[in-house]
Amino acid sequence: KEDKMKYIDQLTSLKNRNYLNENIASWNKNTIYPQATIIIDLNQVRNINDTLGYEQGDAQIKAAANVLIKTQLDNTDIMRTDGNEYLIYLVGYQEKQVVSYIRKLYKEFKNLPYEHGAAIGYSMITNDMKTIEDSINESVEDMRTKKEEIEEEKDEK
């Protein structure tokens, strides 16, 4: 039981970064394609922590985790990899299915307390030329681009 706890994020009950690190090697050997990684970065959590307190920030992180649990697809792993960041690893989904799932997540995240939403990036793996690490890095880049777009939209309002 204690061993299992090593892989569980205490706040959200999702799997954690230890779980990711432990599984990356075997995921890289997986020959079922396509695969995808999705990175989700909750917007404004630091701001919530600073203005409303950590309890509210934690509540936001938990609420987002609950959305991910509620909408989880088969053959996927969901991890909280950082304070306000989540990673989803998917096996056997076409890109249009991944995009449609992300759209659903955007919609769900709009209903979180404080309505700050999230920035979501993804990357597809279609053969063994791309590693999980590469895919995660591409997902992070994609997410950062989305985050900049969100910031620009805010500035224009």
Where are these regions (language model features)?
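A structural signal for short, well-ordered beta-strand segments
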Residues: T37, Y86, A118-Y122
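Conserved long alpha-helical elements within nucleotide-processing catalytic cores of c-di-GMP signaling
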Residues: K4-Y7, N16-A36, N43-K70, M79-I88, ...
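Short beta-strand-to-loop capping motifs
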Residues: I88-Y93, M124-T126
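Catalytic-core segments of nucleotide cyclases and related cyclic-nucleotide turnover enzymes
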Residues: Y54, V99-K110, A119, I125-K157
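Beta-strand residues that line the small-molecule/cofactor-binding core
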Residues: Y19, E115-G117
